[in-house]
């Protein structure tokens, strides 16, 4: 009997991903993946009660913590007679400070019989300081700013060393200056002064002028750039009028445009030509076909298709757009006269068969736009023009001063003061004896001037060459106004007549015929 071959078990991760959704995972697979085994629980709960932080494990210093390392050769026994030696790894110390060691001589003891007072000018013992100490001062220059030479002075007098070092210069500090400007279009500063050497600022422009020539320093300049003069803010150029252009970029095409497919709009044999004068044709042509509300936010730039009812007859707003079913999008072209033409190709649905087919002609609706003539340029005057020279008027230099003593006036006794009321004109104009003359240059007609009744003799001046003369007659003829009678026939009825007869109005009488009966 052959022994069955043992099949290797799949990985724990793959088994857990497959059987987790179905809930058929073995317990050992779930515990291993979710870390709930016995060993995991011991580490999880044991770490909460035991703390190994003081041993320095994992600190990265390599010193073994506070207790150090214990050699592996020694057992766990206890040493007798002394403190256990702590073994630490050897660390290379870094040398700090000067390496040279200065020798110091020993001091001889002072005898008991010697005086306790030590004079300052005498030296009883050896000198504690060395003879000469070599001192080197290094000063690193600052990278920013100009370099400053700092002298180092070393003075040696006797056995004392005195070092005089100049104070270190203060390094330059960076200063950041910010500028905030708010533009006000209604306010503009205009400041002009006499041009001189220097720099001046005008609003946001900086103008640097120099009265004398410049001097070139260094090697010769090989490349010279031609500079153009910038016009001043008060200089305007007069442009000559140019003929109107047909397009914004009047460039000739490199190759001739191919022949377009379809029917030409200007073919009078196949397309009906209809000029349109209504301005709605440019913005909303659909309002010319049928009545609709105006929508100013909608611009018709596409093809419009209109559906008409067969049984109903609709009169369009414009008679030229009768039975229009389809109105194409706008097309722009140029006429031989140079005008811009806006065209739309429309189709009429004049006849409709029983099958539903519509038959109609094609119509070319167009409108020529008026040309914009180029007017002559208007010469503008400069506002606030300055010559650039400042005029200084000094009053004390150009004026003459006269010292007059007002307190003492020798003529004050002989001068009489009059009131200002004497200057008023109290005469009353009544226009008595005035004359009215109305002149005219065209006519020299003479008029008879009657004599007016007056108590005083009046004088009249008659112009021989020109003028009108107005005369007022003494009597007037008032015409009597006669009001006409009404045109309505009046029927007169006599109430006192008891005969029963009446007066017949002439308009009610029987008219005789022109010819009598035969």
Curated annotation (Swiss-Prot):
Start and end residues of each stretch annotated as Disordered: 235-261
Cellular component aspect of the GO annotation: host cell; host cell endosome; host cell Golgi apparatus; host cell nucleus; viral capsid
InterPro entries: Late_L2
Keywords, ordered alphabetically: Capsid protein, Cytoplasmic inwards viral transport, Disulfide bond, DNA-binding, Host endosome, Host Golgi apparatus, Host nucleus, Host-virus interaction, Late protein, Microtubular inwards viral transport, Phosphoprotein, Viral penetration into host nucleus, Virion, Virus entry into host cell
One GO molecular-function entry: DNA binding
Motif extent (Nuclear localization signal): 1-10, 510-517
UniProt subcellular location: Virion; Host nucleus; Host early endosome; Host Golgi apparatus
Membership in a protein family: Belongs to the papillomaviridae L2 protein family.
Described function: Minor protein of the capsid that localizes along the inner surface of the virion, within the central cavities beneath the L1 pentamers. Plays a role in capsid stabilization through interaction with the major capsid protein L1. Once the virion enters the host cell, L2 escorts the genomic DNA into the nucleus by promoting escape from the endosomal compartments and traffic through the host Golgi network.
Subunit text: Interacts with major capsid protein L1. Interacts with E2; this interaction inhibits E2 transcriptional activity but not the DNA replication function E2. Interacts with host GADD45GIP1. Interacts with host HSPA8; this interaction is required for L2 nuclear translocation. Interacts with host importins KPNB2 and KPNB3. Forms a complex with importin alpha2-beta1 heterodimers via interaction with the importin alpha2 adapter. Interacts with host DYNLT1; this interaction is essential for virus intracellular transport during entry.
Protein name as catalogued: Minor capsid protein L2
